From Swiss-Prot:
Its EC number is 7.2.1.4. It comes from Methanosarcina barkeri (strain Fusaro / DSM 804). The complex is composed of 8 subunits; MtrA, MtrB, MtrC, MtrD, MtrE, MtrF, MtrG and MtrH. This is Tetrahydromethanopterin S-methyltransferase subunit G. The chain crosses the membrane at residues 48-68. Pathway: One-carbon metabolism; methanogenesis from CO(2); methyl-coenzyme M from 5,10-methylene-5,6,7,8-tetrahydromethanopterin: step 2/2. It is an enzyme of class 7 (translocase). One of its GO terms (biological process) is methanogenesis, from carbon dioxide. It catalyses: 5-methyl-5,6,7,8-tetrahydromethanopterin + coenzyme M + 2 Na(+)(in) = 5,6,7,8-tetrahydromethanopterin + methyl-coenzyme M + 2 Na(+)(out). Part of a complex that catalyzes the formation of methyl-coenzyme M and tetrahydromethanopterin from coenzyme M and methyl-tetrahydromethanopterin. This is an energy-conserving, sodium-ion translocating step. The lineage of its organism: Archaea, Methanobacteriati, Methanobacteriota, Stenosarchaea group, Methanomicrobia. GO terms for cellular component: plasma membrane. One of its GO terms (molecular function) is tetrahydromethanopterin S-methyltransferase activity. Belongs to the MtrG family. It is found in: Cell membrane.
Amino acid sequence: MDGKAPAAFVEPGEFNEVMKRLDKIDEKIEFVNSEVAQKIGKKVGRDIGILYGGFIGLLLFLIYTVVSSMFM
């Protein structure tokens, strides 16, 4: 070899068929990746919601204890 890549000649029909199959595979991969990203997003959203809920609950509890101790 003299450092050149080997060349292959393919009929245009075969080439188009292979490209269509590769496009279908690419669409499936993109779909799976988007589903995985959506699932991760839901988990992160749930965790953030739990943290916000805990923080607001703690804040309400502190306000309640301060207000109730003022009137005793």
